[in-house]
Structure formats: structure tokens, C-alpha cells
Amino acid sequence: MLHVSASKGMTEYFKNILDNVTELYTLADDCRKSGYDVTDHVEIPLAKDMADRVEGIVGPKNVAERIRELVSDLGKEPAALEIAKEIVEGKFGEFGREVGAEQAVRTALAVITEGIVAAPLEGIAHVKIKKNNDSGEYLAIYFAGPIRSAGGTAQALAVLVGDYVRKNMGLDKFKPTEDEVERYGEEVDLYQSEVTTFQYQPKAEEIRAAVRNISVEITGEATDDVEVSGHRDLPRVETNQIRGGALLALVEGVLLKAPKILRHVDKLGIEGWDWLKELKSKKEEVIEEIEEEKDDFNYEEEEDLSQYEDYEVEAVTKFIGEVIAGRPVFSHPSKKGGFRLRYGRSRNTGFATDGFHPAIMYLVDDFMAVGTQLKTERPGKATCVVPVDSIEGPIVRLKDKSVLKIDTVEKAKQYRDDVEEILFLGDILVNYGDFLENNHTILPSSWCTEWYEKILKSENLEYKKEFIENPDQKEAVNYAKLTKTPLHPKYTYFWHDISKDNINVLRNWIIGGKYNESNDSWEVTYDSENPEISNAKRYLELIGCPHTVTGEKLEIFEYYPLLYSLGYDFDEKRDIVEEIEEKLQNTKNNMHFINTIAPFEIRRNAYIYVGARMGRPEKAASRKMKPPVNGLFPIGNAGALVRLINKAVEEGKTDEIEISNVKCSCGNVSLYRTCPFCGNSVEPSGPSRIKLPIKEYWYKALENLKINKAGDVKCIKGMTSKDKIIEPLEKAILRAKNDIYVFKDGTTRFDCTDVPVTHFRPVEIHVGIEKLKSLGYLKDIHGNSLENEDQVLELKVQDVIVPESCMDYFFNVSKFIDDLLEKYYKKDRFYNVNKRDDLVGHLIIGMAPHTSAGMVGRIIGYSNANVGYAHPYFHASKRRNCDGDEDAFFLLLDAFMNFSKRFLPDKRGGQMDAPLVLTTILDPKEVDGEVHNMDSMWEYPIEFYEKSLEGIAPKEIKKIMQTVEDRLDKDSQYEGIGYTHETLKIDEGPLVCAYKTLGSMMEKTSAQLAVAKKIRATDERDVAEKVIQSHFVPDLIGNLRAFSRQGVRCKCGAKYRRMPLKGVCRKCGSRLILTVSKGAVEKYMDVSQTMAEKYEASDYIKQRLEIIRSGIDSLFVNDKRKQVKIEDFFK
């Protein structure tokens, strides 16, 4: 019985997934019962909803049903508090006081975070009941580093939950001493100077106020090897080191999220938090700036000229504060010629992913590939690059001084080597939902065809769709004149980017030309040596009007709208503007002037240009540990640095390591639960140091698999898990045979960048029509039967489109699973694939590294792009958006058969990125709430565009927009989601970012600055300075410091903080080597100084580099010994 609202078709889809999950679970469980694995059962519990996930990850037992009841009646946050109260009251079993309090806090936090992230497990080390100096008892919550994965709001609510638990247990408030209060301030300062900066920088008084007023102690375990110097050895603080988890909960939780805490406090009626109101009022402006990045708008309003008002928006410079070497800046903040803001959503955008014309992706020398992350100016901090070919492409000036609109990929490839300057980068397509999510003011929309069509509809005017999409220039002008409507966006130039005086200079030059009937163009004289003509030519470039230069002749083929816009009647061959100087004098600005001289209304083409720089490149690669290994079978140092067990066997080597083992009755040492020598069931007693019988286990494994000779098999040196229980060697051999690698938990994974897609064409995913029909894709978005590969289909929410390289890797994984079934478990092969396409329809798990819950998915095809396409709901189910992060896929049967909790490292964070529970059916209500703000409309109403000019808050127009939130708990929550802009191919554009193909850092920075040089919206000198200041200088200084503090290591793996007195390894006697080399210290020195000279960096930067150079030379250059050439002696 499904617990979600869904149509008949979607119900059948979910039933099919559940049946397949059950089939795989049964098969894996049957294999496990053979006794060859760590346990006799599959170790991944299945969860149908959030309540099951919470019980599966943190418990207590039988809590799931009560969570469902409370969430249904009260809502998520009140339910979390109530379940915490019931736990400490003993309704789910008798716990000790501290154990009960800890269980209550963990369970409540798990409810708040939907039972997905690892924070309830790993982010809370423990909860203790401690004593104040007056002997009263209070509650202390020990936070750890992984609490970060919960997010600021959940961190703050964890403290609120702790206070609620404290009250219900009848405990006193935490009463800190002055030393303890000041300790927090010292730790915050030290954390920011030595570790990393917080999202919010609190003042000392705010920290003191919070610590004195919060009723529970926010403390934690040491997370960083940095000690306080002032407030040390405090009786109630167990460490002198920084407590990173506690600081995160205090600063990015309570202090940063104060307004949200107050809303919950008021809503839930919790007392004792009134002190936050004063803190909120003092810091509200700063907090809003961080959370909302609200802009300042300045208007100059005058009577009936308001439509021509000057519009300014304050540039947001935060994204460009740090520029990484080799990663270009595409546009400086709000710089003219940058990405023009356009509203809407394509089938492959939304949920923090923005659309760009694929042509610009090629013109920036392939630095924008499909899936490349960009750090952006607004509305959010980052986005992912995807192609949308229905928006405006770039405008470029060629080396012959001609100007072209590059509106196709073919043109981009044809002219890419001839581009001298990119005058306009094209549109950035951002959906309303991203503004709503970031609570960012709705900025004025660009003048676009969808707005234009809305105006024509509102005035009940007749038009053809072809006219909206691609009108003839004369048709566009005459339609505007006849209907008194604004000029079509296609022929609306960037008049606002030049002054009205510039417009007049351009006008005088243009109307002085003549019509060339032979090629239907307008010709003007061009002389690059003439300053006046050169200036006029530049103005023509800046407004984005295409033209061709041939010798001393400049031809304009879009002459009709240009001439009329400049007040020249082409048909009558006359200037229709009278008293031009008076109009120049009396008009308010450029847009007022151009509208005064033109016979029709001309709208402002762009209000907002968005700045952006490259973040990280796209990724699609198999997950490998460092170094990569085939199995979790430890061999110590017997395999040398390459860790090859077959080499150790050949050379007769072994090693003594700590491992779980037991002496079997047959006389042999068994490392498994079933003795490989006699078949008896044994139970390893626990870890102890033994001399590993590598040779015996190797040949026994080959015998079991009926393999005469295996190739290279890489193994680990030792287990980091608590019990040191190992994986059977047979699995390592079979993985190596199939060229795949293992992760820490026994699974084999593939990582790729998250990209959303709600609709696809069969041709894009390399799957036949009949196969898609068998997977439930019967009709396209228009209700027509699926018949050809170009029809658009709506993606089902748990279906994924993986990269082509992922299919190849999973093809090998499936061969490994089948070999494992046949050769090791003596079962029938399951996948039986002959080619990668045979994997279509099989189930996988999708998982983010900061979580402990996986989501079942189904492969329905693969794309050429190096990204993982999935429904926005699917990404949200992993607590991810799509701003450039990467997650993992792995085959479901692989996880069921090979995953074990007992392989996981016994350290803080060890249980993160492990499928401790698996969600089988995706419920949109229980995914990350950000996706609820994504709009799901087929078109935006005209009111949206009109209201955008007013600079209003996104919530003010939510009633006229439709978002995912409006569809929840209805059958339509899974189907019928719309999009406003079409794109021909979701994987059009460069597939590999240039950053990944270039070699040395010198090559990368040269390419980075070459891109900056040819983009009008970018200043290459500023880019060079920022690269040096924000990347090279900190790296050089950091490496210098690391060199002076470094330890030494040995080839056997031993590491020493200081050189031993003997001067050799105490373990094996070998020579010790440095961990930081000279090359690592000075690797950026030469490139930094070369850049500083070439791009004329400031004297300050040059001098700073000289100081660093002298510091490096003082370490590595001997002033007393100088190498000379033989001829120097004859001088």
C-alpha cells in the first residue's frame, strides 16, 4: 500500500520499483545466509518514509509509527519536540538519564533533518548531565564536526531541542563561569584565523550574550589541532583544542539563525529565549544581508517620465573575492556585457541550475562545459552550467572588426578562432524559484519574446507564432508602428549601454550612409584612423547591432529597425527628427532620448547583468580510495607501496597486522565466519595482531573461484573499523578481474555532478522506443503516443540518466556481481549483460557524501555529458540542490550483497556517506524543502514581468506563480510539471571543461587570462591580481609554513612528527624522506611573478612576491656557496 498521492500510472511505477527492490533484497539475503559474509543478512534496512529512516538510523525501536502520527497532527518541528519528550519519559523503553537525553536529542534532530543527513549520528558526539558550581545539574550537548551537514537551522534547533529536553527532565540551566564565557570568544577568533571563516562573523558581545543565556552547554570534542592560549585547562572543558562542532552550532546555528529560532520559539511556546529578540534587532541587517543578499535600488522618479527612470542595482562582489588560478572570470559584478538576466525554466534547469546558450560555452574556449560550476553574483552563490538554445546567444566582434550574433552552435564553432572580443555573453536563464529560495528581490526582467507575446495577448492583437520567434526586420518595425506596441525584442538593441550623446554621434554617422540594393544592406564609410568614425563604430558594437566590415565599407543588414530607431524613415528616405539638439537637451537619459526620436516604443533590453566566474569543473569518475584498491582485505606492508597481494605471494612476503581472527578446530587461523579450509562456522573473537597467512588465503581464494592465475590485485594495508573484520579475498580478486574498485563500505561507486532534468527526448539518452515503453513511458507531454525519438517525455521521479562512462563502469560492476553470484555463492548469474545498454531498467542507489540514507533510482539511459541527470525531487531526496555538487551512484544489488556497517572506519564521520538506511519510494513532502520553491509553470503571467520592474520581494507575487509546493499531496505532485523554455539537446556544448585538459599551471593561467582579455565584461588585470592575491600568495605562504613544520615519512608507511635521533626509520631502518618537497613550496613562484609583470600588477603585489621569494631563497639557496661556470675564473 503506497503512502503517497499518485496517479494510477505512477502507482504502477512505484509498485514496479518496490517489486524489483524486493527481488534484489531476497537474492542478496539468500547469498548472505551462506555464511561467507560479515553477517547473515542484508545490512541496509528499507524505509518507506521519513519515520522509517529515523528509526533505522538513530532509533529507538518502534518509534516510526509514533513519528508518523505526530508529524501528521502537529507538523515536523513540533513533532520532533514531542517525540523527544516521550523518549525521556520512557515511552520507548527505559534508558538511563544521560542515555535517554542523548537518544531524545538524536531522534528529534533526525526528524528535523528528514532522517537523511548524518548529523544526528555523527554530529552529536554525546549528551551528558553535568553539575554547575552550585551543585545543580544541567544538560551538556557535545557537538562534533559533522553537525555541519545538518545546516544552520537544524544546528540551532538541536540546541532548542536540548533546552526542551532539559526542562522535561527537570534539570537546571547551564551557568557558565566568566572563563568559560571568554573561552568561546577565543575559540571563535582562533577558528577563523587558523581553520576557516564562518558564514557569519559575530561580535564578542553577541557570543557572550548567547553563552550566558542559552540554557544548555554547547560544547564538543576537539576537531582541530589548534589549542587556545588564554583560557586553558578549564575544569568543565575537557580539551584545550578548538571545538569546531560546538562553534558551528553556536555561530552558524544559534547566532546566524536567530530570526528563525524566534519564529519556532513563538510558534511552539517555548520560554527562555526572549534574549534573542534584542540580538535579532541589533543584527537583523547583517543577517538579512547574508541570508538574502538584498540589493539597493535607486530610482529617479519624475512625473510621466517614470518609464525612463534610471535604474541602478548595487553590484554583489562577494563571488569574485577569491579567484582560483586556471578558472576564468566570465563577467565582473554587474558589468555591462555580462550575462543578461532572463526569467524562466527549461527542462534541464531549475533547483539552482541556470541555463546558458551553448554557443557561449564554446566561445569561452570550452571553460564552460555541461555541468561546470559557476560562482555567481545572484540570486544564489553558485550554479551549474547547462545549455538552453532558445535564449539569447552571445554577440562578438571578429578580428576583421565585423560584429555577429552567434545564435547557433555551428556558428560558434565556425567563428571561435576569429573572435576578437565578446561584446555580450548572452542570457542566463534563472527560474523564479531560485529567487524565492534565496529570498532575493525580484529584479527587472530583460526585454524578451515571452514578455512581448504576453503584451500582444493582453491587447488582443493578432500574430503568428513564427513572428514571435523570428520576425522579418520590416515586419517587426511595421507591426510596432501599426499596433503602437514596443519594438520586437530581436531588434531592440542595448541603447542603455551608451549615453544619449553617444547615440546622437552614432545617429549622425548612420543616417549619412546609403542603401545598397544589390545586397539589401545599408552602407556607411568606415575609417579606423578617423577618431569620430571609430567612436561611432564602437557605439554600434556596444548596442549589439550586427554589421560587416569590408575595407573602407561597413554594411548593416539589420538596417530597417536600426534606422527607424534612430529617427530615419527608410521608406521615404528622410530624417523624421526635428530639433535634435533640443531633444538631446530636454530628454532625461539614453532611453528617454531614443524613445523621443523613434516612431515606436523601444524597451530597455537589459536591466541586470549577472557576474560569474568558474567554480569547479564537471565530474564523472569512478569512486576510488587513495590509493585505489580492489578489496578490503588487509596485507600490511607485504605488498610494498603498490599494495599488490599477488606480488607479496610471489615474493613470499607477509606482515603482522591487527585483524579479527579465530583459531578453527581444524587447526588453521580463520579470518572469516566460515573457515575457508574446512568449512566450519566460527565466530572471530575480535582483533588481535597476527602474522597474516597471505599465501594460504590467496591460493585458497583462487581455488574457490576456479581461477588458475589472477592478475594484479590491490589490497588495503589495514582495517580502520572497530572490530577489524575483513572482506573475503575472493571479492577483491573478482573486482580486479573486472577492473573495478571498492569504497570503504564494500560498495563500488561512480561519482558525477548533479544536474536536474524534468523532461527528455529518447534520442538524448540512447534508448529505443520499445524499451522506453516497457519502462512505462507511453505518451509524450502532449498526450500523444510515443512513436519517435524526438518526442519530449516527462521523467519519472526515481529515474536517472547517467553519464556514458558510468554505464561502462557499471557494465563491469554487473560482470563482477554475476561472477560473485556464480563463482563464490554458487548462484545463477543475475544481470547477464552483453552490452552496456542492457543495464537500462536496472536499479541503483543515489547518495550524497554528507548523508547516511540512500535513495533507490532506476537507470533509463545515458547521456554524452559528464553529469548525472535526475529529477529535481531525486536530488532533493539526497538533501542536495544542483549548484555544482557531486554525488554517487552504485548498483543496488552491489550494495545489498557487499555493504557492511562493520567495515566503516571507527572515527568521527565514519558513518557518513554510508547507506545505513534506504528509501524505496520518493515522497516530495519529505525531501529538501528547496525544491518546493521550484516553479512548475508552462509560462509566466504578464503580471510577473510588470511586477519585476518594481523590485518586490518574491513572496509578494507567489500567488500568481505556481511552484512545486502547490502540488504537494496531490496526484499532480509527480506529473505535469511545466517549463517555459525549450532546448534542443540537454547535452549540447563542450563535454569536458578546458581546465581538465590543460596541463601545467602556467598553461591554465594563460588560458584563463586569454578568456578574460577577450570578454568585454571582464578586466584581465584585475583577474591577474586576484589570482595572485587570493590563490598564489596564500598557497606560497602556506607551503612555506608547512615546510618548516613538516614531519618525515618512510617507504614502509611510518610517519614521524620529528626526525628520530637515529636519523632512520625506527620500524624498518630505512632512510626517511620529507613530506613537503622544495618543488611543492615554490611551484607557484615563477608563474606569479610572470603574471605580475605581464599584467602590470600593483607595486604592493610585486613587492609581496619579492618578500616571499626571499623567504624561499633563504630556505633553499646557500648564500655562502655559489655555483659558477669555468669561464667566470678567467674574467
UniProtKB/Swiss-Prot annotation:
The reaction(s) this protein catalyses: DNA(n) + a 2'-deoxyribonucleoside 5'-triphosphate = DNA(n+1) + diphosphate; Exonucleolytic cleavage in the 3'- to 5'-direction to yield nucleoside 5'-phosphates
Annotated GO MF terms: DNA binding; DNA-directed DNA polymerase activity; single-stranded DNA 3'-5' DNA exonuclease activity
Record-listed E.C. numbers: 2.7.7.7, 3.1.11.1
InterPro entries, per database record: PolC_DP2 (IPR004475), PolC_DP2_cat_dom (IPR056172), PolC_DP2_central_dom (IPR056171), PolC_DP2_N (IPR016033)
Entry coiled-coil feature ranges: none
Any one GO BP annotation for this protein: DNA catabolic process
Transmembrane parts of this sequence: none
Pfam families cross-referenced by the UniProt entry: PolC_DP2_cat, PolC_DP2_central, PolC_DP2_N
Sorted UniProt keywords: DNA replication, DNA-binding, DNA-directed DNA polymerase, Exonuclease, Hydrolase, Multifunctional enzyme, Nuclease, Nucleotidyltransferase, Transferase
Family assignment from sequence similarity: Belongs to the archaeal DNA polymerase II family.
Subunit composition and interactions: Heterodimer of a large subunit and a small subunit.
The protein's role, per its UniProt record: Possesses two activities: a DNA synthesis (polymerase) and an exonucleolytic activity that degrades single-stranded DNA in the 3'- to 5'-direction. Has a template-primer preference which is characteristic of a replicative DNA polymerase.
Protein name as catalogued: DNA polymerase II large subunit
Organism: Methanococcus maripaludis (strain C7 / ATCC BAA-1331)
Lineage summary: Archaea, Methanobacteriati, Methanobacteriota, Methanomada group, Methanococci
